[in-house]
């Protein structure tokens, strides 16, 4: 494949999301929606959109079907100036979709999703490694595992930083963890992967993987990273969230984007926390993702 140089390349899960804001999340009952939205989703997919919003050139690599959800996934990427040149469209297959229910009072949500019936990328013939080799950063979410592992090897061989959003324990995840330059995990992942409930111990165990940067996101409690053997903690910004969908996805991107500019890890966390907070002010994983100018203004005022 011919490829132009792209700053930020994502590989992983992409879906079509159906989001609804509800007064409460019902069980065995009905409730009227207060607001609803359809837009593209997926951890690495939303993360890659965030890179484009923050001013980097971006591309995504994954599979979709040629059905209506698949076509919408591609349109949403293109509307966000994320290149789809390396996307694989499988004819006659069903694309991933997700249903998200968001509780109005808290912004917390429940998600039900399906990967459709798509075969994963074949790294031998369906991954644009030239695109990856010319990037500044490769973003992985643990999906498309075989392709992600091969892509990480190519990235590291060409000095491209690997940013791994470790949110879920999946087959092959331990191999991916050991290929990451930036390894920031969710609380749940950190506890399960390290087999300890003490996050202050877990972060040191994560560092044993060899990543340059290890961190843990903790939602409203902020985030932490390890810096030369010292734990740095950054509080989350106080906001009234509308929807927390995608908050972690954009945090990982924002941390990586800032890390390309400075290795001041506290500054990277603060920048990422600002992007995540601003995202949560609007419905949808992508609607509220800020531009760089909006982030800079927010930080000047906080």
What residue ranges belong to the model's regions?
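Conserved phosphate-binding/catalytic region of the ribokinase-like
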Residues: 1-9, 32, 199-302
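Conserved phosphate/ATP/ADP-binding segment of small-molecule kinases
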Residues: 152-233
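A glycine-rich helix N-cap at a beta->alpha junction
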Residues: 79-92
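Glycine-rich phosphate/adenosyl-contacting loop at the front of the ribokinase-like
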Residues: 1-63, 68-72, 78-79, 240
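Conserved phosphate-binding/catalytic loop of the ribokinase/pfkB sugar-kinase fold
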Residues: 89-90, 100-137, 142
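Short beta-strand scaffold segments in enzyme catalytic cores
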Residues: 49, 97-101, 110, 222-225
